[in-house]
């Protein structure tokens, strides 16, 4: 029988509920329990796939092809449990399914309402796919009081009544602000947030109080008195120097022990946190440092590249070095040629990440050219690989080489994928069709040249599986021209039609991949491509 932990937030958004859920899941896992974490997103989009990165941040893609919230990346990185489509639901998807059923006549003429139809759909999602789990953690997006989240709160209230006693627990994340002028922490926002939650029929069992300054015992007792919880259930959550120290910090404050106590578990095994100790030791005690430039389009919001940022950190952990990331707007290079050398020369590695659209593309191509000519370690991901191929084609004499994503071109080195193979068979897409859910999404296999640099990076593997999210693909018709210029196709789809990896054997480290390796990197198991890239950057740092 799985136990359920419902995680809500109050006072303000962006308190770190996702990180808290991931940390608690990791702590329970360290005690030997099987856990899975799910995310309820109240927005009306069916999924975040068509949302602006500036609005939503990164779209995290699962093995089974779901476009999900970036918090699922935290869940997977902290627990090592692969996220899947059934771990994320939105109001948009709930309503889409309900309206489709109504149109089919599945409700037999009944009036379709928020209660019971919407709340039942949410409950069914929460209860599905238990897989002999010990704990299922459910994070509810947004803030208590948001009108969009009311059906989710009602579904939680019903579940807490319907499930067995001590089978559910509510954790509420709040803010205890510090008023500098008064020199005081203020508990009133937390009190009001708990009162708002209680008005919806949900009494929190544990309060996680985010604060900039230590929470004195007197303030903890005050919160406990006014919010009707034990003092030990008021857990301070101070700002941490690294997200990878958060699980250890929460354990020190007694979060996991208090949660287990809420379920009546008093004899739980002690947690094995040695892996977390090793990660934090490597993070806080590096033996060197490198500087990596990320030349992208959405650098104004680093959450747009959340998994990429973390994967670079993981590469640093693998090599025991600190990774300094410089976020560079690719458009700068289109406006000022002198900026290219000024911004790129100090770097030990250049990375061009995935993205969409023409804006900044010429700046990215200029970055590829700089890395190729100056022999600086280069890593191109998704669109970054496509830019590397366009740059290579231009160098090979195809001056008009471009992508059909950017408009009509006489030299379509990159074009839209019209069909590709999935486990279910051939999947097709028409240009001009719907954007949502129509990309090549999820895990696909690739075959590697056993004599290639990339195969060596993967430990000699000739077959790999990586996650994809793209509509456009390098045109294999240009393979001979590109390989003649030195850009080798070292990885292809199993049917040999879709290029997956390119590399330059005459370069210290030049790799482009069509997939997103950052989505599978973890602090305990850094992705080999990021480990190799940072290792090459470390070597470069010793040359300059």
Curated annotation (Swiss-Prot):
Q: Which reaction does it catalyse?
A: UTP + L-glutamine + ATP + H2O = CTP + L-glutamate + ADP + phosphate + 2 H(+); L-glutamine + H2O = L-glutamate + NH4(+); UTP + NH4(+) + ATP = CTP + ADP + phosphate + 2 H(+)
The residues that the entry says bind UTP are 13, 186-191, 222
Can you tell me which residues form the catalytic site?
382 (nucleophile), 516, 518
A single GO molecular function term of this UniProt record: CTP synthase activity
Top-rank taxon, per record = Bacteria
Give the CC-aspect GO terms: cytosol
User: Which PROSITE patterns does UniProt cross-reference here?
Assistant: GATASE_TYPE_1
Name one matching Pfam family. Answer: CTP_synth_N
Protein residues bound to ATP: 14-19, 71
Q: In which pathway does it act?
A: Pyrimidine metabolism; CTP biosynthesis via de novo pathway; CTP from UDP: step 2/2
- Residue span, Glutamine amidotransferase type-1 domain: 291-543
Where L-glutamine binds, per the record, is at: 54, 355, 383-386, 405, 471
Binding positions (CTP): 13, 146-148, 186-191, 222
In this chain, the stretch annotated as Amidoligase domain covers 1-265
Q: How is its activity regulated?
A: Allosterically activated by GTP, when glutamine is the substrate; GTP has no effect on the reaction when ammonia is the substrate. The allosteric effector GTP functions by stabilizing the protein conformation that binds the tetrahedral intermediate(s) formed during glutamine hydrolysis. Inhibited by the product CTP, via allosteric rather than competitive inhibition.
- So where does Mg(2+) get bound? 71, 139
- State any GO BP term from the record: 'de novo' CTP biosynthetic process
Protein EC: 6.3.4.2
Where does this protein have coiled-coil stretches? Answer: none
User: Per UniProt, which keywords does this protein have?
Assistant: ATP-binding, Glutamine amidotransferase, Ligase, Magnesium, Metal-binding, Nucleotide-binding, Pyrimidine biosynthesis
Outline the subunit composition.
Answer: Homotetramer.
* Additional information: CTPSs have evolved a hybrid strategy for distinguishing between UTP and CTP. The overlapping regions of the product feedback inhibitory and substrate sites recognize a common feature in both compounds, the triphosphate moiety. To differentiate isosteric substrate and product pyrimidine rings, an additional pocket far from the expected kinase/ligase catalytic site, specifically recognizes the cytosine and ribose portions of the product inhibitor.
- Role played: Catalyzes the ATP-dependent amination of UTP to CTP with either L-glutamine or ammonia as the source of nitrogen. Regulates intracellular CTP levels through interactions with the four ribonucleotide triphosphates.
Q: Which family does it belong to?
A: Belongs to the CTP synthase family.
Per its record, how is this protein called by name? CTP synthase
From what organism does this protein derive?
A: Erythrobacter litoralis (strain HTCC2594)
Gene designation per UniProt: pyrG
């Amino acid at each position: 029988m799985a136990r359920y932990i419902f995680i809500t937030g109050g006072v303000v958004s962006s308190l770190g509920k996702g990180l808290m859920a991931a940390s608690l899941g990791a702590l329970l896992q360290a005690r030997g329990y099987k856990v899975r974490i799910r995310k309820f997103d109240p927005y009306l989009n069916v999924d975040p796939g068509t949302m602006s990165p500036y609005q939503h941040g990164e779209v995290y893609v699962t093995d089974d092809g779901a476009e999900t919230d970036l918090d699922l990346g935290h869940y997977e990185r902290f627990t090592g449990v692969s996220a899947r489509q059934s771990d994320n639901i939105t109001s948009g998807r709930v309503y889409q399914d309900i309206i489709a059923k109504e149109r089919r006549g599945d409700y037999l003429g009944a009036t379709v309402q928020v209660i019971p139809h919407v709340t039942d759909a949410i409950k069914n999602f929460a209860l599905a796919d238990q897989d002999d789990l010990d704990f299922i953690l459910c994070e509810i997006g947004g803030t208590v009081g948001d009108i969009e989240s009311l059906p989710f709160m009602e579904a939680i209230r019903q579940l807490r009544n319907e499930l067995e006693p001590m089978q559910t627990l509510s954790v509420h994340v709040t803010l205890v602000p510090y008023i500098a002028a008064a020199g005081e922490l203020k508990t009133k926002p937390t009190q009001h947030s708990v009162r708002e939650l209680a008005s919806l029929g949900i009494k929190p069992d544990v309060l996680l109080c985010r604060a900039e300054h230590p929470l004195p015992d007197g303030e903890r007792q005050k919160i406990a008195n006014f919010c009707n919880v034990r003092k030990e259930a008021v857990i301070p959550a101070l700002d941490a120097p690294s997200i990878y120290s958060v699980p250890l910090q929460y354990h020190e404050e007694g979060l996991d022990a208090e949660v287990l106590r809420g379920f009546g578990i008093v004899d739980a095994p002690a947690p094995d946190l040695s892996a977390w100790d090793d990660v934090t030791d490597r993070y806080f005690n590096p033996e060197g440092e490198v500087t990596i430039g990320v030349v992208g389009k959405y650098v104004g919001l680093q959450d747009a590249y959340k998994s990429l940022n973390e994967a670079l950190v993981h590469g640093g952990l693998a090599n025991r070095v600190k990774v300094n990331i410089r976020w560079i707007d690719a458009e700068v290079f289109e406006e000022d040629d002198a900026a290219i050398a000024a911004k790129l020369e100090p770097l030990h590695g250049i990375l061009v990440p995935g993205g969409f659209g023409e804006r900044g593309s010429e700046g990215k191509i200029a970055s590829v050219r700089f890395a190729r000519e100056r022999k600086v370690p280069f890593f191109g991901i998704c669109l970054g690989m496509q830019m590397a191929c366009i740059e290579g084609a231009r160098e090979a004499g195809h001056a008009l080489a471009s992508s059909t994503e950017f408009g009509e071109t006489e030299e379509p080195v990159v074009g839209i994928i019209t069909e590709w193979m999935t486990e279910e068979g051939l999947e097709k897409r028409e240009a001009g069709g719907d954007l949502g859910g129509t990309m090549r999404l999820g895990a696909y296999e690739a075959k590697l040249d056993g004599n290639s640099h990339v195969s060596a990076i993967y430990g000699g593997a000739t077959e790999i599986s990586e996650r994809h999210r793209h509509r456009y693909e390098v045109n294999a018709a240009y393979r001979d021209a590109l390989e003649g210029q030195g850009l080798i196709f070292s990885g292809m789809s199993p049917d040999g039609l879709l290029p997956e990896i390119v590399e330059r054997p005459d370069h210290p480290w030049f790799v482009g991949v069509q997939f997103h390796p950052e989505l599978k990197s973890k602090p305990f198991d850094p992705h080999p491509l990021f480990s190799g890239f940072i290792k090459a950057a470390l070597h470069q740092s010793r040359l300059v």
